[in-house]
């Protein structure tokens, strides 16, 4: 008998935990009204009205301007002390009429609550009834939809706020129009993605010959100023698009936590079949998305989209084993982004040992099938912290966690700089690197972009911290 001993590898442990502290130190996520405002600006002829203090609008618009380098119209009821004590319903009524008078093309106003207006208990639905009567009396020839969006800042995050606003806008409009003739279109909810991602998705649908409507269509967030164009930026999604969603062939949600509930609403109310796939970060998730589209629509995947993943695989294979293998990564941000990036990292031999999710939907995360997929694919232990903040990342680094790379939005840059760890900017907001909102992160092209960004961040770090001629020794 041989004296050789077998080494039994310990199964990887994927541990899901919640931040233990009550207080938040260096938050990594924004409030619910911020997400609701982002959903609102994705619709043409729509101006969100934030029922709260001016700061609830001003600082969010600043984030949008930093990330997209564009100006967006968001209104505020400018709640002050008197309204905080005696109620702010009058501020909403005045705000709606001012917007209707000032913007003749206005067709949709999501009325977004904040922590203060939720605490004082303003009756938004009742106030909307009053506003509808006033609008009908002053503008009998116009139909302006008012959507109630309950987004108190003391719970949830920009992710839940986005999902709540999308669902409320669809519910408000589709309830009026009801079910019509089948359109044969595919509703697509990509979640909180960049304009570059929307452009890529629309190219995929065009190449497959699929008549799809992307909600919300943010392609025009990156558009030039033209003589016939307003100074304010808005999305391409129209009220007609939303109304027609009830007549679609099917709905495809690409983000479990960012808009998927609207697909469930359309299925329950109008019998529109609803499907959910993993956000298409990386090659496999993109393959799965295209197969699902083909299954739903009966369309063939064209040769161009058969060739594209092969190009991506070659590009990533040139980097994976030589440069990425066994490199430890921490990822932070909103849930669909973080879990999707973790899956991508495993495809290219990176090891996402720490995932920080800036949202508290713990019961939902436990049921997320991606956790089991990560466990099945990983050969190392992984910690997933939900309701996390950036102190969780900083503390683990200070306690000795060895990392080769950090992935997340620009608010985590100080942690990376102080720890001297290379960082790839991805997610929202990213304002300390140029042009990232134009580039896709999803799909085959997005996989190549991410791989090259990761490699270049590591290469620059090697040059500045170890050996400026390191590449000669590698090749």
Curated annotation (Swiss-Prot):
GO CC annotations, alphabetized: vanadium-iron nitrogenase complex
Cofactor note: Binds 1 [8Fe-7S] cluster per heterodimer.
Record organism: Azotobacter chroococcum mcd 1
Residues at which [8Fe-7S] cluster binds: 31, 56, 115, 153
Keyword Ribonucleoprotein included in the entry's annotation: no
Co-factor requirement: [8Fe-7S] cluster
Quaternary structure note: Hexamer of two alpha, two beta, and two delta chains.
The name this protein goes by in its record: Nitrogenase vanadium-iron protein beta chain
Gene Ontology molecular function: ATP binding; iron-sulfur cluster binding; metal ion binding; nitrogenase activity
EC number: 1.18.6.1
Protein's gene: vnfK
Organism domain of life: Bacteria
PROSITE patterns with a match to the protein in the record: NITROGENASE_1_1 (PS00699), NITROGENASE_1_2 (PS00090)
Family: Belongs to the NifD/NifK/NifE/NifN family.
Keywords assigned by UniProt, alphabetized: ATP-binding, Iron, Iron-sulfur, Metal-binding, Nitrogen fixation, Nucleotide-binding, Oxidoreductase
GO biological process per UniProt: nitrogen fixation
Keyword Chloroplast recorded: no
Enzyme class: oxidoreductase
